[in-house]
């Protein structure tokens, strides 16, 4: 049996732009992608803290060091520039590996810079 487990999380990213006329996806700074092992074309879930929207899309690489989090295509209708979002990636983990599985969690500041890396979800709220 396999379980669907959180693999990576980008916590409190700020939407830098939205582009309705692009084919689709979320553009993320490649340095930030690397920090939590998210790769181009990987499926992710987006949670918008401002309006409660939850949706899925895939990732495309943005310029390194840019801090970009741009929602493209139809997803652009679910966010506004400045919204705080959470980006979550999942993986199928074999039952025998579930207890050892450690997701990578990056906490970002208002400028989309990583301010903390967590090995697991904290027991308290991270703002």
UniProtKB/Swiss-Prot annotation:
Q: What is its main location?
A: cytoplasm
Q: Which UniProt keywords apply?
A: Autocatalytic cleavage, Cytoplasm, Decarboxylase, Lyase, Pantothenate biosynthesis, Pyruvate, Schiff base, Zymogen
GO molecular function annotations of the record: aspartate 1-decarboxylase activity
- The residues annotated as the active site are 25 (schiff-base intermediate with substrate), 58 (proton donor)
Instruction: State the GO CC annotations.
Output: cytosol
Chain residues that bind substrate: 57, 73-75
Spell out the protein name for this chain.
Aspartate 1-decarboxylase
What modifications follow translation?
Is synthesized initially as an inactive proenzyme, which is activated by self-cleavage at a specific serine bond to produce a beta-subunit with a hydroxyl group at its C-terminus and an alpha-subunit with a pyruvoyl group at its N-terminus.
Any single Pfam family the record assigns to this protein: Asp_decarbox
Q: What is its EC number?
A: 4.1.1.11
The answer to whether UniProt assigns keyword Transport to this entry is: no
Similarity annotation:
Belongs to the PanD family.
């Amino acid at each position: 049996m396999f379980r669907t487990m959180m693999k990576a999380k980008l916590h409190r990213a700020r939407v830098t732009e939205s582009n309705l006329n692009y084919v689709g996806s979320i553009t993320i700074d490649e340095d930030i992608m690397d920090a939590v092992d998210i790769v181009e074309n990987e499926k992710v879930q987006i949670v918008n803290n401002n309006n409660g929207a939850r949706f899925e899309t895939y990732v495309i690489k943005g310029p390194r060091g840019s801090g970009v989090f741009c929602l493209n295509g139809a997803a652009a209708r679910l966010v506004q520039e400045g919204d705080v979002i959470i980006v979550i990636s999942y993986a199928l983990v074999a039952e025998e590996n579930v207890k050892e599985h450690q997701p990578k969690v990056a906490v970002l500041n208002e400028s989309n810079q990583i301010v903390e890396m967590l090995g697991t979800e904290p027991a308290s709220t991270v703002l």
